[in-house]
Regions:
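A short glycine-rich, His/Asp/Glu-containing loop-to-beta-strand
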Residues: 8-41, 48, 131-165
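Double-stranded beta-helix
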Residues: 100-140
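Glycine- and acidic-residue-biased ligand/ion/polar-headgroup-sensing regions
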Residues: 45-67, 160-163
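Beta-strand residues in well-ordered beta-sheet regions across diverse protein folds
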Residues: 43, 53, 61, 95, ...
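Fe(II)/2-oxoglutarate oxygenase catalytic core
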Residues: 14, 21-26, 40-42, 49, ...
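Intrinsically disordered, low-complexity terminal regions
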Residues: 1-8
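Ligand-binding loop in jelly-roll beta-barrel domains
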Residues: 74-114
Length: 165
């Protein structure tokens, strides 16, 4: 297959929204593309963070534990995401384990420290909304009541040919 458009993304952060720039009170967001073996180190300080696997596989080593995806999805259209929640006062290094790794993550100030959690796709609650050609699948990666200060993360999948408002 010949691609008409090719991604210009090399590696690094390709999307960034800070609470200051957006005029928000809490949430910061970035999306990052990495090549195999690349490392990203981050210190949450007084923030909690949710890392969502968009495509590929990663390994995380931290002062709170270690986690690894081995069967990550190919892209956002091929299954439910792996999600890693890390509390405040966590120092971690994430390493790309696949040829290409695409992740998104949001972080915000946290009032309390919670336990880290690694959520596998098969343990992610999914809910179907709508009907007929307006059906959507909501993947509750970090639903309300999850056991964190402020972060909530939901992935919405609209099947081909359907529409969503």
């Amino acid at each position: 297959m010949k691609l008409l458009l090719r991604s210009k993304i090399k590696t690094g952060v390709y999307q960034q929204i800070t609470s200051e720039k957006a005029g928000w009170n809490w949430l910061n967001f970035e999306a990052r593309f990495m090549k195999k073996g690349e490392k990203w180190t981050f210190e949450t300080e007084q923030h909690e963070i949710a890392i969502v696997l968009l495509g590929g596989n990663f390994k995380v080593e931290s002062n709170k534990g270690a986690w690894e995806t081995k069967n990550g999805r190919k892209n956002v259209f091929s299954g439910v995401a792996h999600t890693l929640y890390l509390p405040r006062e966590t120092v971690f290094t994430l390493t790309a384990q696949s040829e290409n790794l695409d992740i998104a993550y949001g972080w915000c100030l946290a009032e309390k420290t919670f336990d880290p959690k690694f959520i596998l796709p098969e343990n992610t609650p999914t809910v179907i909304f709508g009907g007929d050609n307006a059906t959507r699948q909501f993947n509750d990666l970090i639903p309300p009541g999850f056991g964190c200060s402020r972060i909530v993360s939901r992935e919405v999948y609209t099947p081909s040919g359907n529409w969503s408002s």
